[in-house]
Amino acid sequence: LLQIITGDATKGQNLIHHPCIADVHITGSIASHDRIVWGDDPRAQATQKLRGEPLLAKPITSELGNVSPWLIVPGRYTTRELESQAEHIAASITNNASFNCLATRVIVTWSGWPQRDLFLRTVERFLRQTPNRVAYYPGAADRYCRFAGRDGSLEPGQTFPWTLLSAQSIRERPELFTEESFACVCAETCLDSPTPEMFVQEAVSFANDCLAGTLCASITIPRDFQRNHPSGVRAALRDLRYTSLCVNQWSGLAYSLVSPPWGGYPGATLDNAGSGMGAVHNTYLLDRFEKSILTGPLVNYPRPVWFPSHRNALSTARHFIALYQKPSALRLPSLFWAALRG
C-alpha cells in the first residue's frame, strides 16, 4: 500500500507518531532528524540525548545532508581534461538549482598547483554560461545571503547568481565547511602541503575531519599521478569516509545508477546521525557495505546529459523515459542518437 500525503510540518509530525506507522524514513537535514527524534527545543534535545531517551519510540532510518567535497589532485591536465572536469563541477553546482544534498559545496585544491587559477576561472566561466534558476526552496534567500556573504535581503522566488568563493579558510568562514548551505554557493579552499603526494593525504584528512557529512565525495586524479602513485591513490580511496566515492565524475552519477547503496557512512548513531543511518537504492541488497567507488575518464564521451551545455538534453531525457515506460532494444538507437547529438 502506497499513500502519498502532502502537508506542513504539523501534518508530518502527526503521521510520524500515528499508531499505524511502524517505521520512519526521512530525507532532510540533521536538524529535521533531531527535531523528530529528540524534540523541538535544543536544550531538551541535549537532555534527551544525555539520558538516551528519544521521543520517537519507533525505528528510524535517514538520508541527511552533506557538505559534498570535490578534491582536485594536482597534475598536468590537458585543456580538454581541465575543461571537462570544470564543467563536471559546474554541473554539480547548478543541477536542480543547487538544491541537492550531493551538490558540490567545497572544492579542495593544492596551493602549489600551477593550473589552479586557470581551473577556477574555467569553473566560473561555465557557471556564468548557465542561466540562473529560480530559488524555489523555502529559506533559500536567507541562506544564500548568509553563505555568500551578501548584505541586504533577497525575495523568495528570485534567481540568485551561481557563486564560487575562492581561497576560503575554515577558520574565517567555518559555516561554509560545517553546515550544508542548500543554496547555490560553493567554496574553494587550498591546502599548503609540501608536495602533491602529501596534499592527497592531507586533503583526505581535511574532508574526513573538517567537513560535515559522509554521504558522497568526488576526486579528480590525473593519469600521471595514478600511474606514478598507485598506492597513494588506493590509500586515498580506502581512507575517505564517504559511502559513495566518484573518481573524475560527479557523485550524482552513482546516485542515478540506483544499484549502489546510498546513505551515510557506517557508524552513525541516533544521537549523532551525521549523513544518516541506513541506506536506500542498493538494488543488489548488499549487506554490511562500507562504500561504493565509481571511476570514469577525465573526459566523457558522449557529453553527459546533465551538463548544462548539452545541446539535446530534453530529447535525450524523453527517449530515456520512453525506454523505461516500455523497455525494448528497438528504442536504444534513438536514445543513443539523441545523446550523441549533445
Region spans (language model):
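Short hydrophobic/charged patches on amphipathic alpha-helices used for structural packing
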Residues: G12-Q13, V204
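Conserved residues at the C-terminal ends of beta-strands
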Residues: D8, T27, W110, T220, ...
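ALDH superfamily catalytic-core signature
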Residues: H17-D23, A31-E172, E197, V247, ...
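PLP-dependent aminotransferase-like
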Residues: L1-T10
